[in-house]
């Protein structure tokens, strides 16, 4: 997303906020099945179809210079990872917030670390500007539970059931959207802002059970 915004020279037109969303809030600390099997089970699809979907996501990542290895990801509960992110965000340093998110992505998608493991979270937290004691104290508490749940409830209310998802000017874009399609969305949002009507409601993207599309004039 940000690479595309830089290409379009529109980074200064948007403000960013990271939101929490767990695909499986009831997941165990470490799952006994891999991502391919998990997706097949969750979305009631053949294992081979699930594998191809993951390969497609890996391909999209590589096109953006990201070394995704989803097929060997270690699944586990991500709640504490979200709490850690919220904690770092609360300290008001955007760079560290972005850093912990990138570290978590790298740990999960590329290094295939178990991000429910407290030792992993402590190490990542330290790299993102926290002390070991800070992270240990956070993990031993219930702090930032409310903040994570509020983000998730907001996502559910918008019809979100998977990741990635983006909310651009209150419009939801779900799924791994191809670059050209995302480019079209971003430029359309900016154009709509410029020609916003008197009622203050721009044209935008509509999402329903069939996917996301632009409103017809």
Placement of each model-derived feature along the sequence:
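Structural alpha/beta surface segment adjacent to cysteine/selenocysteine redox centers
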Residues: 2-108, 201, 213-214
